[in-house]
Amino acid sequence: MSNVLVLKSSISGNNSQTNQLADYVIEKLQGNNIVVRDLSQQPLPYFDTAAAIAVRGEPKTTEEKQLLALSDKLIEELKNAQTLIIGAPMYNLNVPTQLKSYFDFIARPRVTFQYTANGSEGLLKGKKAIVLCAFGGLYDEENLVTQYMKSILGFIGITDVQFVYAQGIGFGPEAIEKAQASAKNKINEIVAAL
């Protein structure tokens, strides 16, 4: 049995293509220890000055201490997972604010990454990530969502990353059905190899 952390970030609830794909992955991974964190239904606080002070490990106020405790909890969930499933829809060419806030809270110096003479080094090595992307249009792999997800995951040490795309969902019901079928086929391939 493996520990799996599922991050949902869509604001569209059950209508979300990435949430539907995440639920499909959860169904395929039954029998594993699965933790689901819905960043839209349980939003994190806005990452502000107090949060920045907290994640640097220098909390002084009650608010900063609470934010550090939240960061610790999120990082513990992530550290416990061998596999990370991330729903990352494209909103205005980038990831949802909720997902960006999550990474702001877990990207902590000397905890999930460190600086070395050769640059930054991620400390969460040996994990797999599957990123579920949904795009209204058609985009190549140079899109900002893919590039951001590769960069931030690599920054914290997760380099075994696979992407599943449901593209063209803005073209209507037939396009959604086709995109979902294609994405589910890709998920089946990935899950079979886990």
UniProtKB/Swiss-Prot annotation:
Its cofactor is FMN. Homodimer. It catalyses: 2 a quinone + NADH + H(+) = 2 a 1,4-benzosemiquinone + NAD(+); N,N-dimethyl-1,4-phenylenediamine + anthranilate + 2 NAD(+) = 2-(4-dimethylaminophenyl)diazenylbenzoate + 2 NADH + 2 H(+). It comes from Haemophilus influenzae (strain 86-028NP). One of its GO terms (molecular function) is oxidoreductase activity, acting on NAD(P)H, quinone or similar compound as acceptor. Keywords: Flavoprotein, FMN, NAD, Oxidoreductase. Binds 1 FMN per subunit. InterPro entries: Flavodoxin_fold (IPR003680), Flavoprotein-like_sf (IPR029039), FMN-dep_NADH:Q_OxRdtase_AzoR1 (IPR050104), NADH:quinone_OxRdtase_FMN_depd (IPR023048). Its EC number is 1.6.5.-, 1.7.1.17. This is FMN-dependent NADH:quinone oxidoreductase. Pfam families: Flavodoxin_2. Quinone reductase that provides resistance to thiol-specific stress caused by electrophilic quinones. The keyword NAD applies. FMN binds at residues 10, 90-93. Belongs to the azoreductase type 1 family. It is an enzyme of class 1 (oxidoreductase). The keyword Oxidoreductase applies.
